[in-house]
């Protein structure tokens, strides 16, 4: 078979399965290429700071219902996400706001409990500084909003991780290995199925 839109025959599929040595070799070559790209053009470092957020449902709604809990959690979480990305908070990070909002910072929050503040940078120390500053600025701003009555008074925040932060590459090596191996094998399938041997 050498036409792209022609369905493969049983013989073509058998030929693919018989070439197991080629698949193993192709996977190794693809993974090696992925590793080479990773080390030649490494992704940025990522640091993670954590702020523990407790909405205290029991105190906010002594006779609560699930619907009240959900609405309260969704409303207050949305307000706090807006705070995290606000100009006042980002201005304290000593970096261009456009750059920070353009992918250098990422927020992962499960509504209640640990809110994770991620910062990416080529310099691992700078990534740590950004993540730590962002988490602390958020906690201070949120506390000020609680005291001003703009957030529920029962919300409690605590910066639990802002020093000696874990730093790792923003994209793990395993992703590069998998992408390299998969890409090489897909190319190999195309070659074996659609290029007729002489």
Task: Walk through the language-model features, giving the residues of each.
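Hydrophobic and amphipathic membrane-targeting/association helices
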Residues: 1-198
């Amino acid at each position: 078979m050498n036409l792209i839109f022609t369905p493969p025959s049983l013989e073509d599929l058998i030929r693919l399965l018989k070439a197991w040595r080629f698949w193993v070799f192709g996977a190794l070559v693809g993974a090696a290429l992925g590793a080479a790209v990773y080390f030649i053009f490494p992704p940025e470092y990522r640091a993670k700071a954590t702020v523990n957020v407790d909405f205290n449902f029991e105190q906010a709604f002594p006779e609560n219902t699930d619907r009240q809990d959900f609405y309260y959690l969704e409303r207050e979480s949305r307000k706090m996400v807006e705070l995290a990305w606000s100009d006042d908070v980002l201005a304290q990070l000593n970096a261009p706001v456009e750059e920070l909002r353009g992918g250098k910072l990422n927020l992962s929050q499960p509504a209640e409990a640990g809110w994770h503040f991620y910062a990416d940078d080529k310099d691992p120390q700078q990534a740590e500084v950004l993540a730590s500053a962002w988490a602390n600025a958020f906690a201070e701003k949120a506390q000020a909003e609680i005291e001003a009555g703009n957030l529920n008074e029962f919300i409690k925040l605590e910066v639990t991780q802002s020093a000696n932060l874990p730093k790792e590459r923003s994209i793990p090596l395993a992703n590069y290995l998998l992408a390299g191996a998969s890409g090489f094998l897909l190319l190999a399938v195309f070659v074996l199925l659609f290029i007729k041997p002489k």
